[in-house]
C-alpha cells in the first residue's frame, strides 16, 4: 500500500482495521514520524519510493519528461522488487514501453522487507507483448544439487515453470546436518572444512 500519513489518517477502513487489531496508535506514530522527517528535510527509503511514485503519478509533465528520457529500462533481480518499485517502472515505461527485467521467481526471499513475487509472476499481464527467455542451464552446481533444488521448487503453487539442469559432474550425495542454532551450524560446517583440508589436502580456495 502506498499511503502518505495524511492519506492513512483519512482512510476509515485502515483506521477501523487498526482499531480492531488494537494498534490505533499507528496513525499517531506515522503522523509524528512524518513531521519529524519534514523538519529535518529527510526521507527514509520508503519515503523515496512513495514520493517518487506520487510525483510521477500526479504530475503528467514530469512523468512524460522522464519516461521520454529513459528509452530503455533494465531491472535486475525483479523478483525482489516491491509494489512501489513496480509502479515506478510502469510509469517510466509508458512512453517507449521498452523494458527488460532479469529475475528468478525461485529466488524470491525478501518478502519480509516488502518484495512482491507477483511482480515477476504476473509481468505478462502488465506487458502483454512480453517475451520470456528461460536460462535453464546452471553453471555453478552439480546435477545432484540441481535435482534436489528442483524437487523442492516443483511443489511451489505459483511459479514460472523451468527445467533447470547442469552439465557438470553428478557430484556427491548431499549430507543432511541437524543443528539447533545458527552458531552450531557454523561450528559443524567450519569443522567439516577443517577436516576436509586435513584429510584430502584441499585448499581453502
Model-based region annotation:
Residues 6, 12, 47-49, 113-116, ...:
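Solvent-exposed, flexible loop/coil residues
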Residues 128-131, 136-205:
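Helicase P-loop NTPase motor core
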Residues 11-17, 69-71, 105-106, 165-173:
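Short linear capping/connector segments at secondary-structure termini
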